[in-house]
Amino acid sequence: MIRLSLFISLLLTSVAVLADVQINIRGNVYIPPCTINNGQNIVVDFGNINPEHVDNSRGEVTKTISISCPYKSGSLWIKVTGNTMGGGQNNVLATNITHFGIALYQGKGMSTPLILGNGSGNGYGVTAGLDTARSTFTFTSVPFRNGSGILNGGDFQTTASMSMIYN
């Protein structure tokens, strides 16, 4: 009788069935961009330029700007985007004056072009002009004549956006 009661008890007891569920884990490893020039616009003022002196090698203006990067692992990348002047120059911003642009270089001088555009998404590697001890970046802007075209007088301007990030 005890066996029969035990058998009936076992039959009446429901068996719990466990079902496997998947756990989805997501997120984003976010590398924050650097703050450039304390978040203020950078002004490069050439003043008056004599068109006869625009020979792509003089009249440069060098700027040193502060950079603050909360994440400093890997290499520093810079991205400068703006209207590129034609003629095969990948570091020259077009201005509103025909045949006249502004060439950009990393560091002081004209040995390392500051290439414009997205590059690999983060821009291009910084190879000159970085002073990590002072948290600054130096770049040089140079008046540029495309070809032998005549430069008309007048106010000129161009704009670009700059961002920097470690990656």
Curated annotation (Swiss-Prot):
Signal peptide range: 1-18
Record lineage: Bacteria, Pseudomonadati, Pseudomonadota, Gammaproteobacteria, Enterobacterales
Alphabetic keyword roster: Cell adhesion, Fimbrium, Secreted, Signal
Protein name (record): Fimbrial adapter PapF
Function in brief: Adapter that links the PapG adhesin to the distal end of the tip fibrillum. PapF is required for the correct presentation of the adhesin at the distal end of the tip fibrillum. Pili are polar filaments radiating from the surface of the bacterium to a length of 0.5-1.5 micrometers and numbering 100-300 per cell, and enable bacteria to colonize the epithelium of specific host organs.
Keyword Membrane attributed: no
Keyword Signal: yes
Subcellular locations according to the entry: Secreted; Fimbrium
Domain of life: Bacteria
Further details from the record: Strains of E.coli that cause infection of the human urinary tract produce pap-pili which are hair-like appendages consisting of about 1000 helically arranged subunits of the protein PapA. These pili mediate binding to digalactoside-containing glycolipids present on the epithelial cells which line the urinary tract.
Taxonomic source organism: Escherichia coli
Listed GO CC annotations: extracellular region; pilus
Pfam families the UniProt entry points to: Fimbrial (PF00419)
Biological processes per GO annotation: cell adhesion involved in single-species biofilm formation
